[in-house]
Amino acid sequence: MADNVDQWSAAGRKNIFGNTVKVVEMQSEAGAAGAVHGSLGAGALTTTYTASQGLLLMIPNMYKIAAEQLPCVFHVSARTVSTHALNIFGDHSDVMACRQTGFAMLCEGNVQEVMDLSPVAHLAALSGKVPFINFFDGFRTSHEIQKIAVWDYEDLKEMCDMDAVDAFRKHSLNPERPAMRGSHENGDIFFQHREACNKYYQALPAVVEKYMNKVNEKLGTDYKLFNYYGAPDAEQVIIAMGSVCDTIEETIDYMLAQGKKVGLVKVRLYRPFSVDAFVSVSYTHLRA
């Protein structure tokens, strides 16, 4: 993924802001995360790509990025974290290790969903002031060759909140607007400051849903925080996220044809987890 961006940059391809993206290769994922942190602090919209052990090396900087309300997106092709042996295939053991960093987590199940919903992560990060892990299954999704409908840059530009972009840049380190960062706090005030960010996470599901609705309007899709597939009065429901959802949907079609009442709740926004949205979808279709 990063290699494609590098090729586009070398070819002079412009982004929605009319700029050629600068690509920097660091010595390791730890260095990449530090560079992302510094770049964001200087007011540059920044993203990175990683997976598995590489993502784990980024965790210390992820805590800082999230706590400083720096809107970025880490695109992660989720892969197994190697233990007694190397395993390069897709599970979620890497992204699950990042649940408490403060990053929001958005998941896609196939190549078309990655194309459609990746902008939602970027747009919601800017408006919501919360960084995102945008993840999909390694190899099963990240290396699948598939024909997809791609975004028109003008459509993306229309959805981008330029006021949020300006606010982010004004928040950057600048000698004309001196501010203190990286201070030391004792326990009496540290906890209060840490909890002060809760309101952003409480508001974030609505922000994500807003941009999903904008995507739906432009593409004719039906993306929600949680999507349901199956019988309207299901007696058995599977809750899943990632590429397995496509397989489950085919299985549900087969079982519905046999008269079985089954369904699937597809999780898209995993963090922050909206209990209200989850309960609304589940109880609408699940027969007690």
What are these regions (language model features)?
Residues 85-88, 207-223, 240-248, 267-274:
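A general structural motif
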Residues 4-8, 63-65, 122-124, 149-152, ...:
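Short, solvent-exposed amphipathic alpha-helical segments in soluble enzyme
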Residues 17, 132-227:
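Conformationally flexible catalytic loops at phosphate/diphosphate-handling active centers
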Residues 1-97, 102, 119, 139:
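Thiamine diphosphate
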Residues 232-260, 273-278:
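Redox- and metal-dependent alpha/beta enzyme cores, enriched for Fe-S-associated oxidoreductases
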